[in-house]
């Protein structure tokens, strides 16, 4: 109990604890016997004003995560429990070589202060809890008494006002975590909840490129211009997907699928696109479906690849091991992102490393830990390997560029202006706007941004539909990248040998033939080119939406383009 060591109420306990630690330091050779006896004889001196000292001693989110990572590695190395490992770290005289970039950490902390809600709008709602802490904003009745509810079992429930939170983390392409902030506003406690490092959330559509699309390209099942139908994979009359709202309202939830076949209205088409539409039954090139984050297109790619193949890749190769092997091996989880627990922002950012050159490296917060004599005590246990071929990685890089640079992209025009450097990204929205994401990459860094409530809650209940958008996460990422990259020299993404640009027919998706009146340019693996189109086309062809050009201007109005 920390109250036992309150220096104002129990100073004798604190002196005893201090002297016990000093004795251990002497016994372990950290200090001499003379130093121990001199220090143990000193009285306890309390400062009159400790507020500034307490504030300055609050550790950053990065330091908190670093502490936990090193403690975990000591536990594994020495075979000791957590308390022993913590004591070893406190008293062992170790030097930790951290991966943090101080300038980037400071810039991220300043942005995540979110002064005047500059980046993340404040949404508040009442949350029912069984106890209230000193940090909670308790809901009171008009007469000044706490708002409560008593359950049937006698449990008293209280209410607190909670606001939207956010997290951000940046890595380089060697897995080094460079900056991390796990909450909005000023940090007031050390080792507080770190939403960037230790909290899992549903991924929404951010899982589409690292799973279905990447493997579809890797396996040669689809390419840049593969034409896919913008319609549900399953129709209502197929009786595959239950309409749970209908079943719930009509008392059918307990029925088996066989019994439910007698109720045609108990089924629905699936999936829907963001906003509730089922598509227009048109054929669209793959790049367009990814840029617009159309569920109807992604689910067809995922169906070709297979949910189990996607799960095995993201779980084992990309180390998203907080996914659930018993409940997440399905298209809804692996393509739509509605997982049981989800993943942390740090793990998701690490997964997007593969769109640089195909390499994956385990994210880590330190390189080495040295003992007091300068000997290596720990080295980070990260692993690095080729998760995708460089060719697939580069095609995916170009595809994800369209999210930011194409007029139809879900984050159209919101790329950072950093000395002409390119970027890629993917938006993501979990069901009912409970989790909003953006993961973005530049030639230097990859960053994940999450926004939502700590306890998942539909953000449109407290913010307008126009406010609860992924563009909030994109805008924060854009501002942060422009700050940390402003003095960096121009750097391109590494182009892969074996990837070629080719003109394709916008009607067939095949390489453009002499009779194709409408063409666009795509990126293809040289060993997996489409056939050449030899169709006979009608003369009245409308120009199709175009992918991002090498130099793209920002659309005049992008306010209505968020679709995911």
Where are the language model's segments positioned?
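Glycine-rich, acidic and aromatic/proline-enriched surface loops and short helix-turn segments
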Residues: 1, 68-76, 170-186, 217-221, ...
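Surface-exposed intrinsically disordered loops and tails
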Residues: 126-158, 237-280, 324, 458-468
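Primarily short, surface-exposed interaction patches in extracytoplasmic proteins
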Residues: 311, 316-345
């Amino acid at each position: 109990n920390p109250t036992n060591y309150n220096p104002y109420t129990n100073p004798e306990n604190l002196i005893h604890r201090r002297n016990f630690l000093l004795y251990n330091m002497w016994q372990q050779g950290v200090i001499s016997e003379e130093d121990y006896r001199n220090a143990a004889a000193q009285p306890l001196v309390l400062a009159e004003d400790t507020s500034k000292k307490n504030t300055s001693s609050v550790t950053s989110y990065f330091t908190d995560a670093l502490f936990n990572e090193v403690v975990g590695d000591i536990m594994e190395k020495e075979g000791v429990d957590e308390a022993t490992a913590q004591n070893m770290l406190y008293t062992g005289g170790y030097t930790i070589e951290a991966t943090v970039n101080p300038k980037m950490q400071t810039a991220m902390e300043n942005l995540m202060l979110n002064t005047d809600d500059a980046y993340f709008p404040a949404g508040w709602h009442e949350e029912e809890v069984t106890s209230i802490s000193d940090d909670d904003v308790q809901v009171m009745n008009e007469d000044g008494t706490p708002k409560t509810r008593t359950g049937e079992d006698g449990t008293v429930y209280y209410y607190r006002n909670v606001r939207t939170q956010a997290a951000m983390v940046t890595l380089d392409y060697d897995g080094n975590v460079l900056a991390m902030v796990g909450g909005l506003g000023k940090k007031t406690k050390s080792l507080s909840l770190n939403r960037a490092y230790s909290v899992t959330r549903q991924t929404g559509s951010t899982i589409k490129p690292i799973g279905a699309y990447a493997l579809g390209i890797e396996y040669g099942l689809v390419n840049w211009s593969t034409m896919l139908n913008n319609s549900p994979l399953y129709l209502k009359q197929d009786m595959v997907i239950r309409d749970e709202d209908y079943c719930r309202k009509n008392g059918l939830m307990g029925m088996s699928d066989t019994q439910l076949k007698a109720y045609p209205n108990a089924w629905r088409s699936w999936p829907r696109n963001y906003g509730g539409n089922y598509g227009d039954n048109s054929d669209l090139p793959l790049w367009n479906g990814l840029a617009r984050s159309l569920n109807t297109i992604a689910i067809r790619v995922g169906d070709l690849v297979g949910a189990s193949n996607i799960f095995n890749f993201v779980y084992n190769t990309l180390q998203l091991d907080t996914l659930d092997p018993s409940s997440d091996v399905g298209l809804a989880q692996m393509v739509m992102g509605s997982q049981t627990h989800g993943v942390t922002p740090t793990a998701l950012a690490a997964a997007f490393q593969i769109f640089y050159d195909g390499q994956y490296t385990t994210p880590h917060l330190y390189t080495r830990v040295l003992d007091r004599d300068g000997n290596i005590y720990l080295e980070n246990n990260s692993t690095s390997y080729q998760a995708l071929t460089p060719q697939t990685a580069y095609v995916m890089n170009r595809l994800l560029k369209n999210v930011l640079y194409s007029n139809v992209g879900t984050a159209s025009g919101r790329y950072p202006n950093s000395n002409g450097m390119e970027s890629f990204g993917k938006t993501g929205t979990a069901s009912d706007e409970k989790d909003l994401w953006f993961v973005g990459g530049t030639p230097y860094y990859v960053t994940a941004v999450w926004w939502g409530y700590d306890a998942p809650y539909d953000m449109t209940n407290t913010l307008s539909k126009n406010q609860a958008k992924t563009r909030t996460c994109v805008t924060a990422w854009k501002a942060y990248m422009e700050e940390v990259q402003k003095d960096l020299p121009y750097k391109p993404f590494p182009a892969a040998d074996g990837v070629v640009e080719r003109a394709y027919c916008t009607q067939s998706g095949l390489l453009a033939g002499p009779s194709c009146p409408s063409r666009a340019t795509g990126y293809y693996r040289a060993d997996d080119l489409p056939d050449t189109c030899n169709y006979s086309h009608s003369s009245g062809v409308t120009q199709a939406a175009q992918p991002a050009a090498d130099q793209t201007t920002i659309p005049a109005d992008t306010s209505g383009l968020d679709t995911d």
